[in-house]
Amino acid sequence: MKVHEKVSELIGNTPIIHLKKFGINVFAKCEFLNPSHSIKDRAAFEMIKDALDSKKINQDTTIVEATSGNTGISLAMICADLGLKFIAVMPESMSLERRKMITLFGARLELTPANLGMKGAVDKANEILLNTPNSFMVSQFENISNKNAHRKNTALEILRDLDNELDIFVAGFGTGGTISGVGEILKEKLEKVHIVGVEPLNSPLLSKGEAGSHKIQGIGANFIPAILNKEVIDEVITVSNEDAINTAKELAKSGLMVGISSGANVFAASMLAKKFPDKRILTMLNDTAERYLSTDLFA
């Protein structure tokens, strides 16, 4: 009998599905099947585990993080699983379903004015850190454990499940953890692999140096994260809000209930499939559509 004692033991080893409708050689890794239904479970667990192992935190530490969504939900789940206190700070403009998920896990939620954006949330998180004894900021955009979660696990799962046969890897980037961690290992193991980054058409920061507002939550953070390894990215494809949302809706018609950034990833992969029909392409299905009930995905 194989049973698990901790929710964190359920993270990873997500299956890969063949998306024939979007290209004969297009495949996707189903990260929405992680326990809190997003790829961020991987990084959240690794960041907390490494902090515990290195004695940066203990069972009495209060974890603090400024977050706009999935990372906050994943951290709330991990902290609940491990018996840690967690305070999430997010702009009040974030969706109601995100707020409710975080508090459902027992975390404390602090909202900041919408007009201050993520900077306002970061400033408030730093204030809480200063005023809370034995507290720790996760700092997902700078925390190398974020990237290492994908080096140690995600990338190796991909190589194992595809028998080391992959030509193109496609991923959006928010913190940069997934594309950097997976990309670094794939580059080490597969001589000719091509790594493609996906960013919003309305915020082509890496490809054109321009930042703007967009509707593809989870990618396009409007700044270059410290852990993003630009050296592993061979090409960047921009995807419009409409194409990302419409592709997510098409995925739903195939039975895959995924979010907007997953739509962006699959749209980019389908474009590459038309250009390179004989190449094996893998992308990521990052999270579940249920996280977007109040967005244009359900309009």
From Swiss-Prot:
Keywords: Amino-acid biosynthesis, Cysteine biosynthesis, Pyridoxal phosphate, Transferase
Catalysed reactions listed for this entry: O-acetyl-L-serine + hydrogen sulfide = L-cysteine + acetate
Any Pfam family: PALP
Cofactor(s), names only, from the UniProt record: pyridoxal 5'-phosphate
Enzyme Commission number: 2.5.1.47
Keyword NAD: no
Name of this protein: Cysteine synthase B
